[in-house]
């Protein structure tokens, strides 16, 4: 009887997990509720005992050894995913922030879709965090899943934001991508991601932004948000493509 109860409990847990995952797919705003194609094109991370894995751990140890308090605080400040962290490269003035609520709503929906797709890949690979593999690494932030290192969700978010905003404001593309580089690298500064996690997150963002562009609902919402943004930073409407 005990064995039957255990099997029933496990089955129920699996059903609940599957149900929760399916429910999350229903929350997608722009992308189709099918992450399989995305996950299939994500290359696997370096093997656990490979020279590349060792090199990436050594790189993180070197970053940790050289890390200053200012770098630590900057990395901690980038822990939250917030479109306002990219206002600097856009030249958004404080007085204009309130007018950008429609942009924030749009980007929150983009982030939601990106997050659902990237989490599907994280579950597929279940890569342990660097500090799990190398105890000498002391992360400067907590509250991250120990086995969801690859791809980096922060990297995917940062590059998705930069690429979407660069489509709206191509005049600031270089500055936006530089901010995304910094945003993503801060995850290595804190010791919670390998370099290959960051690279995979960027590739995921590039793939997803292309897919966003195929969806009519996304294109309409992006056009509206772009108008709001360009008006707020005193730029003329983006030329028609």
Give residue ranges: language-model regions.
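N-terminal Sec-pathway targeting helices
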Residues: 1-13
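Hydrophobic h-region of N-terminal signal peptides that target proteins for export
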Residues: 14-20
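Hydrophobic alpha-helical bundle signature of multipass membrane enzymes
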Residues: 21-189, 221
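Short alpha-helical linear motifs
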Residues: 128-131, 158-160, 198-206, 226-229
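Interfacial helix-loop-helix junctions of multi-pass membrane proteins
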Residues: 182-213
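Acidic, carboxylate-rich catalytic segments that either coordinate divalent cations
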Residues: 213-241
């Amino acid at each position: 009887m005990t064995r039957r109860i255990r099997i029933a409990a496990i089955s129920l847990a699996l059903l609940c997990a599957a149900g929760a995952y399916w429910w999350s797919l229903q929350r997608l705003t722009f992308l189709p509720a099918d992450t399989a194609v995305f996950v299939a094109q994500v290359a696997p991370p370096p093997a656990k005992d490979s020279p590349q894995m060792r090199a990436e751990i050594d790189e993180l140890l070197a970053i940790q050894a050289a890390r200053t308090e200012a770098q630590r605080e900057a990395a901690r400040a980038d822990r939250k995913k917030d479109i306002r962290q990219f206002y600097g490269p856009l030249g958004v003035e404080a007085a204009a922030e309130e007018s950008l609520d429609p942009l924030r709503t749009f980007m929150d929906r983009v982030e939601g879709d990106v997050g659902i797709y990237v989490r599907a890949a994280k579950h597929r690979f279940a890569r342990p965090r660097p500090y799990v593999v190398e105890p000498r690494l002391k992360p400067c932030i907590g509250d991250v899943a120990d086995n969801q290192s690859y791809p980096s969700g922060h990297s995917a978010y940062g590059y998705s934001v930069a690429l979407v905003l660069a489509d709206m404001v191509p005049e600031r593309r270089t500055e936006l991508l530089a901010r995304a580089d910094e945003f993503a690298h801060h995850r290595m500064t804190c010791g919670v991601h390998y370099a290959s996690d960051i690279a995979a997150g960027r590739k995921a963002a590039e793939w997803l932004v292309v897919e966003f562009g195929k969806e009519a609902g996304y294109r309409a919402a992006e056009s509206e948000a772009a108008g709001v943004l360009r008006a707020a930073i005193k730029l003329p409407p983006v030329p028609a493509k």
